[in-house]
């Protein structure tokens, strides 16, 4: 418990605080982390080869930059090695990028007025169907990526990423974003997806507290609701108020859930799990408890992998 708690507390200072928006509702700010999807704990140095395809070089450069900037707990996650340098590397990322666009002529029908009411020029009294020549544009981006561990040649990660956008361009419609803009946005999204698969991430999220007063005595209801309101200005104070309530009343599902959030906010993941479990046993409604437990699991795995990685870094 101690190592997990200490590591989680460390995360409070290392999280991406820029992602936190001011809480407008009754929420508590939780700093957490997600592990890498791929098994990369022992891969400290990484190289990105040029991807195949016309856009492969630019895609690989963007991915290399994302991996070089990837951090966890305030430390760079990878040491990026240029593949042409000949320097030792632990992993090699390769892939393909294919972007294509296809346009086909299509005909759409429109109703056109051919005669207006002489007494009211805005009122149509006769319409006909006319053909409009349009173009149907289909833009496709097909990307594949693979990560190979140099030490044993094992494929640690492989994933296809496909995106498709279809629009119909007609002279009487406003123009949609250009195909170049679509390709650029898709490349950015795919690069970010790969980065999140290959490196852990820290983040902050505002989680809404449970406002239910069911099961509480009248005096406890008043104190509970006051703590809920306090979350807007003093989250620590709200948690202290809920904790004080447990000395006088049996925790309800809502109180247990909120105390789970408080402990998660403070980095005590074990205590948070206990409170969430209590809320779950008492029949807490909705998906909030399930989501909280899943978030705790991801955070624990991220912290565990980071501890193992630091050991590998020390051995190196």
Predicted feature locations:
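N-terminal signal peptide c-region/cleavage motif recognized by signal peptidases
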Residues: 20-22
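N-terminal segment of the mature soluble domain
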Residues: 38-106, 152-154, 281, 287-315
């Amino acid at each position: 418990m101690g190592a997990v708690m200490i590591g989680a507390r460390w995360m409070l200072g290392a999280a991406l605080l820029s992602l936190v928006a001011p809480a407008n509702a009754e929420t508590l700010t939780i700093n957490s982390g997600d592990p890498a999807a791929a098994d990369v704990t022992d891969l400290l140095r990484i190289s990105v080869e040029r991807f195949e395809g016309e856009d492969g070089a630019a895609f690989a450069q963007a991915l290399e930059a994302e991996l070089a900037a990837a951090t966890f707990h305030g430390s760079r996650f990878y040491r990026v090695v240029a593949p042409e340098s000949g320097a030792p590397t632990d992993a090699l990322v390769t892939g393909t990028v294919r972007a294509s666009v296809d346009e086909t002529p299509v005909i759409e029908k429109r109703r056109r007025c051919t005669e207006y009411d002489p007494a009211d020029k805005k009122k149509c009294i006769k319409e006909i169907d006319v053909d409009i020549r349009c173009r149907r544009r289909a833009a496709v981006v097909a990307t594949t990526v693979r990560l190979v561990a140099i030490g044993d040649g094992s494929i640690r990660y492989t994933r296809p990423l496909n995106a498709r956008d279809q629009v119909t361009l007609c002279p009487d419609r406003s123009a949609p974003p250009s195909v170049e803009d679509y390709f650029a946005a898709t490349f950015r999204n795919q690069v970010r997806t790969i980065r999140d698969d290959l490196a852990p991430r820290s983040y902050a999220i505002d989680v809404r507290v449970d406002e239910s007063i069911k099961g509480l005595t009248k005096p406890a209801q008043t104190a509970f609701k006051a703590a809920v309101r306090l979350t807007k200005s003093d989250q620590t104070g709200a948690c202290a108020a809920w904790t004080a309530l447990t000395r006088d009343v049996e925790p309800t599902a809502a109180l247990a859930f909120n105390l789970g959030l408080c402990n998660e906010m403070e980095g005590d993941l074990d205590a948070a799990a206990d409170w969430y479990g209590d809320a779950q046993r008492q029949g807490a409604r909705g998906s909030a408890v399930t989501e909280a437990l899943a978030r705790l699991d991801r955070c624990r795995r991220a912290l565990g992998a980071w501890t193992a990685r630091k050991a590998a870094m020390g051995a190196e």
